[in-house]
Amino acid sequence: MSKYFNKHYWIRKLFVNNFFSKFVNQKLLNKIVFNSIYKSNHWNKSKKFDQSQSYSGPGSAANSIQTNNLINELEKFFKENRIKNILDAPCGDCAWIKRIFENNIEYTGIDIVKDLINKNKEIFKSNKNVNFYCKDLVEYNKFDNFDFILMRDFFIHLPLPL
């Protein structure tokens, strides 16, 4: 089906429009846009989800060279610096970082998309070191509780100009 008949396409277009965004609370705007991106599986061009892809976009694919290199470096850094608890914000669908969960690290993921957080809670419910919360990172203020804060894809989602 053409993207022009996709309701999520129009929701994003409407709310990202600079004119309209002046009249909408920024917190509500972020929620609407990112929920729409998740529900439409916007980042996954094939529109089919499998374990090698991610609802969070192509940069979050679990088996890419870029992702494997990053995970290897993070594991090394965590070990060398005795990192015991991390905050991942926004966490997305955790497709790329779940290997970290095997390293006895307390992991907290936050994301603005409630359905995504609920799905993560279901998928990782057997892992007692993993917690997820639906929070808007722009308003989150409990950073002192973590040894390391990962904000891999946060800055590219900020509206410009800041």
Q: Residue spans of the language-model regions?
A:
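Conserved N-terminal segment of class I S-adenosyl-L-methionine
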Residues: 2-138
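Short conserved loop adjoining the S-adenosyl-L-methionine
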Residues: 139-144
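A conserved beta-strand element that flanks and buttresses the S-adenosyl-L-methionine
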Residues: 150
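Hydrophobic adenine-recognition pocket in adenosine-nucleotide-binding enzymes
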Residues: 154
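A short, conserved alpha-helix within the catalytic core of class I
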Residues: 157-162
